[in-house]
Structures are given as structure tokens and as C-alpha cells.
Swiss-Prot record:
Lineage: Eukaryota, Viridiplantae, Streptophyta, Embryophyta, Anthocerotophyta
GO molecular function: 4 iron, 4 sulfur cluster binding; iron ion binding; NADH dehydrogenase (ubiquinone) activity; quinone binding
InterPro entries: 4Fe4S_Fe-S-bd, 4Fe4S_Fe_S_CS, NADH_quinone_OxRdtase_chainI, NDHI
Domain of life: Eukaryota
Protein's recorded name: NAD(P)H-quinone oxidoreductase subunit I, chloroplastic
N-terminal signal peptide: none
Annotated ranges, domain 4Fe-4S ferredoxin-type: 55-84, 95-124
Length: 183
């Protein structure tokens, strides 16, 4: 009889423990139901990158003095600077400048160390192509400013995105900027 009471007690303790586990699972499920989704439907919605996002490099031809600092600080010696020396003014004159974004690691060293600030990072991150040779940008392609997602009339901004918090993922789940194409 004593073993039957112990068996019933063990069974009831296991049933209570199982119901606790199920309750904890329901709490986690209900907690996740109130959160915003972490993913977006990419072609139709776009995230607005943060202010310090390192996207495609923008180049201003008129500001460049052909000092080649960008080539020296680049970990892969990527920027190709072609110049000729003008003897009458005793200065270098820039002939061409190009960067191959198929090889670029977007470290930002060239932008940071440029003495004339002729290089800057843009918000553009959509650089995919079917031909890798199209990723080799010359000074004309580098000089074009990208159309900002915020200024594009075919895309609608939904809410704000904040990368400045220490709890990036927590803030990401609470408030973010998502853009949506207008129908």
C-alpha cells in the first residue's frame, strides 16, 4: 500500500512538473507574439542603414590631389590611381581613379586617411551584378551619388531604426526603420 501511495505521489509530481514546462513554453510563445519580426521582405521593404554604415565609396575628382594615401592604407592595395606630373605647376594631375568593388572589403581606411576628404562612404549596398567586371567603378561611376532610400518616392518609410543602443538586437526588435514600396 505504501508503494502505491509513493507511485501516486511521483505521478502527481511529474504531472505538475510537466504542466510547469508547458506553461513556460506558452509564456515564451506569447512573449514572441508581441515582438516585431526581425526579418523583412527584401525587395519590397528596405532597411535604412545607420549614419555610420560603410557602403559604396563616393569619389570627388576635383578634390583629389593624387597623393595615393588611399592606396597605401588599403589592406589589399585596391584603388588604382593614374596621374601625371605637371612640370609647369610642379604638381601631380590626376588622370583616372578606379576601385573594384568585387574585391573591396569596405574597411573604410581610404576614406578615413584621405587628406582632402575626396572619398566618402554612401548608404548604397545594392551592388550585385551578373558580371563581376561591372563592379570595377571608374571616377565617373564613383562620382555619382546614389539615390537615397529616404528620398526615393517609390519606397515608403515605416518606422525609425536605432543602432546607437548597447542592446542592438533588443532595440532592433522594438523600433526600426523599414521601408516599403508603394503600390
Amino acid at each position: 500500500m505504501f508503494s502505491m501511495v509513493n507511485g501516486f505521489r511521483n505521478y502527481s509530481q511529474q504531472a505538475i512538473q510537466a504542466s510547469r514546462y508547458i506553461g513556460q513554453g506558452f509564456i515564451v510563445t506569447l512573449d514572441h507574439m508581441n515582438r516585431l519580426p526581425m526579418t523583412i521582405q527584401y525587395p519590397y521593404e528596405k532597411l535604412v542603414p545607420s549614419e555610420r554604415f560603410r557602403g559604396r565609396i563616393h569619389f570627388e575628382f576635383d578634390k583629389c590631389i593624387a597623393c595615393e594615401v588611399c592606396v597605401r592604407v588599403c589592406p589589399i592595395n585596391l584603388p588604382v590611381v593614374d596621374w601625371k606630373f605637371k612640370k609647369d605647376i610642379k604638381k601631380k594631375q590626376l588622370k583616372s581613379y578606379s576601385i573594384d568593388f568585387g574585391v573591396c572589403i569596405f574597411c573604410g581606411n581610404c576614406v578615413e586617411y584621405c587628406p582632402t576628404n575626396c572619398l566618402s562612404m554612401t548608404e548604397e549596398y545594392e551592388l550585385s551584378t551578373y558580371d563581376r567586371h561591372e563592379l570595377n567603378y571608374d571616377q565617373i561611376a564613383l562620382g555619382r551619388l546614389p539615390i537615397s532610400i529616404i528620398e526615393d518616392r517609390t519606397i515608403e518609410s515605416i518606422s525609425s531604426f536605432d543602432f546607437s543602443s548597447k542592446k542592438i538586437m533588443e532595440e532592433h526588435s522594438k523600433s526600426r526603420t523599414v521601408t516599403k514600396f508603394l503600390d
